[in-house]
Amino acid sequence: MGQRKGEIMSNIDKYEARKKMVYDFMCDDMYVPMKIKELCIVLGVKKEDRPQLEQILLDLQAEGRITLSKRGKYSKSEIKKTVGVFTAHQRGFGFVTVEGEPDDIFIPAEYVNGAMHMDTVEITISPVTTGRRKEGKIVSVIERGIKQVVCTYEASDNFGFAVPDNTRFGTDIFIPKERSKGAMSGHKVVVEITSYGKKGKKPEGKVVEIIGHIDDPGTDILSIVKAYDLPVDFSEKIMHQVQNVAKDVTPADMAGRMDLRDWMMVTIDGEDAKDLDDAVSLYMDGDNYVLGVHIADVSNYVQEHSALDVEALKRGTSVYLVDRVIPMLPRELSNGICSLNEGCDRLALSCIMTINKKGEVIDHKIAETVIKTNRRMTYTNVKKILADKDAAVIEEYKELVPMFEKMAELAAILRKKRMKRGSIDFDFPETKVVLDEDGHPIDIKPYDRNVATKLIEDFMLIANETVAEDYFWQEIPFVYRTHDKPDSEKIAKLSTFINNFGYTLHIGADEVHPKELQKLLMKVDGTDEESLISRLTLRSMKQARYTTACTGHFGLAANYYCHFTSPIRRYPDLQIHRIIKENIRGRMNDNRREHYESILDAVAKQASETERRAEEAERETVKLKKCEYMSNHIGECFEGVISGVTEWGFFVELPNTVEGLVRVTDLTDDFYEFYEDTYELAGSATNKRYKLGQKIKVVVDSTDKIMRTIDFKPAE
């Protein structure tokens, strides 16, 4: 058996070598286009080997590397090649993302050419018909994107297979027994790929880490942590550096700072928050509001180029998974000297804004300060004061109540002004997963976005805008939060789609104003099609990112925007704090400007990439726990709303934010047809219909933790 396998692999290697030789021959500067008969003569191909040459030529054509003329002559392809990153689909096809291309390039399964998920590939793009998605062929793999993969191990007698958690990987991995590290069936393992395989051969790898058994508490989330390569522990060098950081603010630390310790100010956070990096204050100056947004001066303790700083940049952001937080900075810092704890002297960077009744910032000051918060407030208690008018809570915080009432007044003014200019508010309910001590979900519910959370959101937004505008006009190197305008093609598609529901978008000069999208979302609010149109509107927009150019934030309809308010958990905020402080201290000379100009593009790119990674990991843990939660409710009945309809079924969203699929194959009472113009499934005999926004009772049929999917069946 082993000898036969060796012969097969030897033949494959010979074939690939001959294919390379033929292609190299055609790439020679002296080569002239030839017919197959001429190629046989020049290359000395025997009559019995001609079928193999024909197959080689067919393969090279399929890969887009050579072309066949109308006269039957072969030559090297002159089609322009493009480089991008391949995103695989479990059904074999995929997409290549090319920088500068508004849409991904579709790669049919037959033209994937051995590429795997996240590989950097070279492609040729096929001629495209107007209005259709671009298609291409993968010519070669330039660099493998995945070196290690998290898998479930399946042991056999003399070998094992590792089944990747990421179904996009497309195949399981052969593990020789001597490279299994003693893993047993059911173990979650990290596999390092040693060979990516060739035609007819699976990839091979070795187990480098056993995470734990699939049934052990915490193994599921830890597997996601490993899959996204999220750094968890801090090195001894970093922790030693942290131990040397002062635990208290000294008089020397306060020197040269504005002393605001006698100002009335509070932090407002969730009950569980320990890293309190923002405080707010408010007083009236005549008819004007003086709003202070006071941010922990983390840069005072994280010095540029230190081991701690290098690690913070590498992480880019804190990651908030359902059962744990993976912090950007060690907790000794983020929960200690950098946390604006009640009654403690703390160093801060404050943005103090004078705002008139129209919501206009008519004056502002950005300063290094020393502060002391009066109370550590929670969103719950501030809501009880402002919305619920809870007498007991109002009495407990009676000295702060007048300030909270003025804050609510100002927040409403700021929100109204933002909405007037066209700011878009996607009010999708976020999910809160409640876990027991072993990490199992015991409840899932929508996150409560109330008057208190919105108040803090409004204040942070105006501070971020004010700081960004200040530094834009000073022409100082900076990191901005940018949200580019949507591509005109995507907006055109959205416009065509919403016409089916009687809505229109006013598009001028090939672009849309954010106010148009805001109006659309307001029109669909409360309608059956709200969920679908809101999601499609979101998908038509670009992702926000960090840049060194200030080109505005489309979603907020803001000309200037940055992230200034969360330096404990976001590196861009920490980075601009350093810039602001150097500028305040008069040290922003030509050398320092050149320094920042040389590093900020890389900082912005790293921060954008780590943010994407964190968001994906966070989403995966929520989806995983939703599956686990619903697996404990198999056979139970729930009422939900149809949130999406396709030709293969419809999606139902429950009040707790869980979404599942009712497959059309499970609608056994009739034959159902899909009507794309109205997004309905209709029974051909009964005319029974399933449409967007329709309330429906469903039974939980099955869940798949690997695929992160939930299937429902109609209860009736």
Model-derived features: positions:
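Electropositive polyanion-binding surfaces
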Residues: I41, S195-Y196, S223-K226, L230, ...
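Charge-lined substrate channels and their catalytic hotspots, especially those that engage the 3′ end
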Residues: G2-G292, S299-D345, K383-K384, Y679-L681, ...
